[in-house]
UniProtKB/Swiss-Prot annotation:
Protein name: UDP-N-acetylmuramoylalanine--D-glutamate ligase
Signal peptide residue numbers: none
Gene Ontology molecular function: ATP binding; UDP-N-acetylmuramoylalanine-D-glutamate ligase activity
Organism: Mycobacterium tuberculosis (strain ATCC 25177 / H37Ra)
Keywords per UniProt: ATP-binding, Cell cycle, Cell division, Cell shape, Cell wall biogenesis/degradation, Cytoplasm, Ligase, Nucleotide-binding, Peptidoglycan synthesis, Phosphoprotein
Gene3D superfamilies in the record: Mur ligase, C-terminal domain (3.90.190.20), Mur-like, catalytic domain (3.40.1190.10), NAD(P)-binding Rossmann-like Domain (3.40.50.720)
Gene it is expressed from: murD
Length: 496
């Protein structure tokens, strides 16, 4: 279709033909939003404070505006569609809220257009969120749907944006959504949605933990609500869900209306009386995390009728994504694992607990999260720690309090002096890569080279050198993938 219906359904209000819409953010998401709004007959104006981002929009004939000017003109817009990076505290969005102008995200726009039939019969949305495990679970879910012969597309925070896939002939969408996307998707009501777990994260974006949790809870407002019962916050969200069908999953034996583990097999007692799905040993993701991801994906797949055989086939052939518990090398009895995607303390704890003896490479940007509970839980697995990144002092302090016998090395990068010179641990060492850097290396590469070399000196045969940073990467790297590649490069250098 190339235009909005003549009689605009309530689900699209206030979006209608000719409606003036402010698109907040001119990058990739903003480009997709502006294109869709233009296609369906609205009148978008693109807002960004970077002239480079506005230029392509202006060349297409769209009006553009700076954020300060948009604030002054905010009452002239019927709607604001914001990119996920815009928090509610952003002056532009705060002004829109104060003026009573509705604010949607790109996911909200996609949901409403799909629900209104603008792309044909609406798809069934199967949505996954949680602090950790979203990408693996959503990818597993998609594989299960395909193995079951269903026409499904992987999208959202993984693969393609939802707006970009609505023209595809799919009946089901396997959608990964972040808390940012969910915050700006207030009307989302998926066919089925899962909350894997809830832990402190992104508190630099959300004003409070309660707001972060409330955003995640939006996936549980549809027909089927699924949540991890081993996580107290996720379990509480399931208890409060308005969904007609509520399903839990756990590592232990399942009760009625649950999926779980019995006799080393995944079992469904929610969508069947007692159906064995697959052996735990066939799950390629290591540790309890892999079992939980498979249970969540299976619950969503079973909610739309995917048979057990297809679920087992999909899991058995599943391949873990890059930088997610990825074994980089095994040398001299030491295993080197890249879990750079463990970008918060909750994820790092799960990663460490998957191995019996770990030399832990950690640090980065903690985004306001505390590590004390996580370090206390993993202390017995740690045989050493190498700390990197801007917030490594917080990691050092948690180790000092909860794992005082664990040797620690801290890697300093040049002018970065935000860390105390020593910490209260039996073996403390500070390495300054600026004093011994290699020509042509970036700061991140130099830091990782020193970190892996230090970890190798600590490790013994049978140990795992594990990159599970517990923080974001943007202080020293371009992203978690860049950090993981730097780790792999450093590992190859140290084992040759």
């Amino acid at each position: 279709m190339s235009g909005l219906p003549r009689s605009v359904p309530d689900v699209l209000d206030p979006l209608g033909p000719g409606a003036p819409v402010l698109v907040a953010g001119g990058r990739v998401t903003g480009q997709a939003v502006a294109a869709v709004l233009t296609r369906f007959g609205a009148t978008p104006t693109v807002c960004d404070d970077d002239p480079v981002m506005l230029r392509p929009h202006a060349e297409r004939g769209l009006p553009t505006v700076s954020s300060s000017d948009a604030v002054q003109q905010i009452t002239g817009y019927a709607l604001v569609v914001a990119s996920p990076g815009f928090s509610p505290a952003t002056p532009l969005l705060a002004a829109a809220a104060a003026a009573g102008v509705p604010i949607w995200g790109d996911v909200e726009l996609a949901w409403r257009l799909d629900a209104a039939g603008c792309y044909g019969p609406p798809r069934s949305w199967l949505v996954v969120t949680g602090t950790n495990g979203k990408t693996t679970t959503t990818s597993m879910l998609h594989a299960m749907l395909i193995a079951g012969g269903r026409r499904a597309v992987l999208c959202g925070n993984i693969g393609s944006a939802v707006l970009d896939v609505l023209d595809e002939p799919a009946e089901l969408l396997a959608v990964e959504l972040s808390s940012f996307q969910l915050h700006w998707a207030p009307s989302l009501r998926p066919e089925a949605g899962a909350v894997l777990n809830i832990a402190e994260d992104h508190l630099d974006w959300h004003a409070t933990m309660a707001e972060y949790t409330a955003a995640k809870a939006r996936v549980l407002t549809g027909g089927v609500a699924v949540a991890g019962l081993d996580d107290s916050r996720a379990a509480a969200l399931l208890d409060g869900s308005p969904a007609q069908v509520r399903v839990g999953f756990r590592l232990g034996e399942p009760a009625a209306r649950e999926l779980g583990v019995r006799d080393a097999h995944l079992v469904d007692r929610a969508f069947s009386d007692d159906l064995t799905l697959l052996p735990v040993a066939s799950i390629p993701v290591p540790g309890p995390v892999g079992v939980l991801d498979a249970l969540a994906a299976a619950a969503l797949a079973r909610s739309v009728g995917v048979p057990a055989g297809a679920i087992a086939d999909a899991v058995t052939s599943f391949r873990v994504g890059r930088h997610r518990a990825e074994v980089v090398a095994v040398a001299d009895g030491i295993t080197y694992v890249d879990d750079s995607k463990a970008t918060n303390p909750h994820a790092a704890r799960a990663s460490v607990l998957a191995y019996p003896r770990v030399v832990w490479i950690a640090g980065g940007l903690l985004k306001g999260a505390s590590l004390h509970a996580e370090v206390a839980a993993m202390a017995s697995r740690l045989v050493g720690a190498v700390l990197i990144g801007r917030d490594r002092a917080a990691v050092a302090e948690a180790l000092s309090r909860h794992a005082p016998d664990v040797p620690v090395v801290q890697v300093v990068a040049g002018e970065d002096t935000g860390m105390p010179a020593t910490v209260e641990v039996p073996v403390a060492c500070v390495l300054d890569v600026a004093k011994d850097d290699k020509a042509g290396e970036t700061v991140g590469a130099a830091v990782m080279t020193a970190a892996v070399a230090a970890a190798r000196r600590m490790a013994q045969p049978g140990d795992t050198v594990l990159l599970a940073p517990a923080g974001a990467s943007f202080d020293q790297f371009t992203g978690y993938a860049d950090r993981g590649e730097a780790f792999a490069t450093a590992v190859r250098a140290v084992i040759r």
